[in-house]
């Protein structure tokens, strides 16, 4: 209560304060029949007794007529609540404040919605009146937890490990492959700044500058259009170090998270387990596995290799063909026929992948189209390798390895959702399973032209030391020194050891990616002037906090988020500007026809 005229907050009064005269400020949350009201501030609630005697009639009138959510000041004496009227659900439930004087500091007009966590509001309405939504205890708690976590991260990095907090520019230039960058016009005709997707180049240049250890709570920008649960501006904990290897960065992040982790969420165990990209794809069908539950993908190619099933033999005749399956525990008991059909339909529509099912009946017999093609030996081997129990359901896919694994990985998650919706506890919502995923490919074929390559992450990632020679002979086979941090099936961080050789960086840009290296001449020149080996990582702060507090959306951990279409519904941004305002930037708007007509009308 330093620097302010209140004596206490609304959440701190206890029995020990009985008899004290206090001054409270807050919002009127509730008022009952002219007898008492509940005053709320950032810390909690206090029950205020409205005086009934003639001497305080003006106080009674003022407090009885104050609309809900009005801001008031109340001075009074702390008293114990009468026997039987204590409220164990409130931290201040043993006391009440008997009002002696009061003042309405600001009256509130009719609210667009009630400020109570249990009352459902449309998200659009919450976003439009975000300053009201922020009064809810849930958002208050989320933002304060976020603030505390960032403070402990600063303490760990700067005070304990010598990192330097540096602000990097947000006005820069477009980078190769930076198609998702926001452009900012300049007064030089035809020239634009770009808002960086991350401080990547600047943090590398800080290492060239000898800063050794850099850290920033960085604002980043990405123009991705309409994407649910993505924000056009977001925050990352950005880190770079000189003279470090992959293991060093990983140990740093494990220590950072352990130090800053909120006490009320339990402790996290380190070191985090690690898995290669290939292992993650083969066992979970994704590079961000949720390891809180089993149902791993199992390779059954060898079991069925000798069978005369046409689609099996057809799949295995291809170089990367495989037969894989997942076993859904108690699937027969918890999933309906409609559920199974929806799973197969998802595989078909999303991955163009057919699925076969095997249902293990309670008597041990199978219900499947495959039964007539399989001998007892193959059935026994499948039962063993898939660990099939009665009432389990197996989903089986045959085809190209990556496609089969990706489809089964998606069905694994969909099945888990269906099982939990039907009442089977599968994933512990209070558990936090961290995982490092390593050894990603350095390059991937472009979706629009598979004969050309693009960076799997970004063009500054160094090749794996074991694969360095392959960079010049067969870049498609090169693994990278990139590492992702995954939490409960969500990517919460990503980083890499960087290329610190100008020659190698130029080769990657020009020969492998077919990009104009001149655009990055400032970085390549810096690498020629004594760049140390270096690497780093960025943690997605919004995503991390949303997982810690189990928020349904990252919008619930950001003070003023954009809608999923990238709009600010409160301030109505983005907005139109006049031709006169555009003139200094040498820009004219070319209106789509329908908008032209709308503006005319």
Regions found by a protein language model. Give the residues of each.
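Class II aminoacyl-tRNA synthetase catalytic cores and aaRS-like
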Residues: 1-601
């Amino acid at each position: 209560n330093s620097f302010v005229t209140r004596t206490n907050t609304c959440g701190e009064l206890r029995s020990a304060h009985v008899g004290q005269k206090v001054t409270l400020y807050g919002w009127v949350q509730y008022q009952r029949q002219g007898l008492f009201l509940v005053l709320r501030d950032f810390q909690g609630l206090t029950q205020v007794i409205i005086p009934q005697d003639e001497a305080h009639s003006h106080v009674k009138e003022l407090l009885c007529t104050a609309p809900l959510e009005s801001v008031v000041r109340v001075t009074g004496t702390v008293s114990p609540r009468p026997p039987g009227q204590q409220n164990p659900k409130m931290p201040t439930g043993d006391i009440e404040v008997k009002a002696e004087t009061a003042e309405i500091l600001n009256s509130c007009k009719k609210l667009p919605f009630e400020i109570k966590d249990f009352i459902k509001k449309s998200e659009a309405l919450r976003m439009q009146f975000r300053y009201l939504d922020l009064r809810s205890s849930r958002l208050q708690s989320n933002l304060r937890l976020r603030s505390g976590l960032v403070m402990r991260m600063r303490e760990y990095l700067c005070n304990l490990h010598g990192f330097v907090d540096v602000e990097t520019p947000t006005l820069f230039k477009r980078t190769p492959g930076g198609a998702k960058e926001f452009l900012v016009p300049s007064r030089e005709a035809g020239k634009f700044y770009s808002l960086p997707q991350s401080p990547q180049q600047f943090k590398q240049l800080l290492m060239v500058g000898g800063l050794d250890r850099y850290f920033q709570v960085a604002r980043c920008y990405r123009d991705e259009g309409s994407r649910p649960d993505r924000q056009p501006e977001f925050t990352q904990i950005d880190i770079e170090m000189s003279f470090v290897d992959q293991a060093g960065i990983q140990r740093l992040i494990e220590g950072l998270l352990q130090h800053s982790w909120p006490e009320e969420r339990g402790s996290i165990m380190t070191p985090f387990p690690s898995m290669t990209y290939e292992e993650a794809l083969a066992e979970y069908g994704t590079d961000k596995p949720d390891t809180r539950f089993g149902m791993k993908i199992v390779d059954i190619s060898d079991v069925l290799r000798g069978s005369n099933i046409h689609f099996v033999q057809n799949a295995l005749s291809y170089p990367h063909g495989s037969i894989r399956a997942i076993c859904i525990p108690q699937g027969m008991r918890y999933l309906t026929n409609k559920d199974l059909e929806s799973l197969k339909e998802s595989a078909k529509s999303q991955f163009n992948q057919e699925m076969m099912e095997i249902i293990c009946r309670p008597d041990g017999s199978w219900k499947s189209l495959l039964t007539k093609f399989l001998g007892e030996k193959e059935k026994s081997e499948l039962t063993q390798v898939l660990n099939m129990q009665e009432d389990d359901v197996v989903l089986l896919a045959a085809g190209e390895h990556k496609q089969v694994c990706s489809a089964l990985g998606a069905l694994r998650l969909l099945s888990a959702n269906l099982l939990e919706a039907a009442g089977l506890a599968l994933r512990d919502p209070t558990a936090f399973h961290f995982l490092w995923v390593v050894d990603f490919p350095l390059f991937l074929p472009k979706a629009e032209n598979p004969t050309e390559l693009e960076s799997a992450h970004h063009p500054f990632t160094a090749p794996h030391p074991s694969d360095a020679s392959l960079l010049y002979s067969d870049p498609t086979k090169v693994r990278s020194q990139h590492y992702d941090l995954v939490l409960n099936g969500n990517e919460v961080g990503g980083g890499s050891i960087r290329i610190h050789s100008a020659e190698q960086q130029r080769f990657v840009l020009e020969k492998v990616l077919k990009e104009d290296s001149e655009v990055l001449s400032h970085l390549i020149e810096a690498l020629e002037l004594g760049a140390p080996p270096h690497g780093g990582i960025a943690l997605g702060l919004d995503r991390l906090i949303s997982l810690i507090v189990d928020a349904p959306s990252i919008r619930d951990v950001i003070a003023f988020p954009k809608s999923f279409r990238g709009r600010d519904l409160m301030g109505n941004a983005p907005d139109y500007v006049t031709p006169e305002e555009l003139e200094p930037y040498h820009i004219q708007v070319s209106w789509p026809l329908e908008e032209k007509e709308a503006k005319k009308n």
